Amino acid sequence: QIDVESTARTILIRIREKGAFSSGSALLNTSFVSVIDKIAGALAQIEGRIAVEGHTDNVPINTFAYPSNWDLSSARSVAVVRRMLDVAPLPPSRLTASGFADTRPQAINTTVDGRARNRRVEIVVKQPLDEQSGAMLREIR
């Protein structure tokens, strides 16, 4: 239920809803807490800003706790950030939490599988420029 992608200075960790959260909930599944703990421990060892982003499918939610998918996606990202801060020596200034609701789908929302792929939390690590890249950018400016 976890995918990891890496480019030059970005690491993307994609967590599918089914592993981390029950449907319509922002409470981390107890079976998944250790996974978040490992991710947090690993991220504490590297530099960079960490953006935790919550995403949903386009099926409306309207509960007392989560009146909309905006609320649910935001609450899920905050739950992950809180857990990471609780278990790893991460400065809070390195982390942000954002909810995107259904505005950034990965798949079409017309199928069960597509909706499942869209329900996710992504941890995006933006690593700082190395000295050579930084010098090159300064020259361009």
Model-predicted regions and their roles:
Residues 39-49, 80-83, 87:
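Structured segments of extracytoplasmic/periplasmic soluble domains
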Residues 2-14:
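Short edge beta-strands and adjacent turn/loop segments
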Residues 14, 20-33, 55-137, 141:
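Periplasmic OmpA-like peptidoglycan-binding domain that tethers envelope proteins to the cell wall
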Residues 9-11, 48, 102:
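Beta-strand-connecting loop/turn residues
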Residues 1, 47-49, 92, 118:
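Short secondary-structure junction motifs
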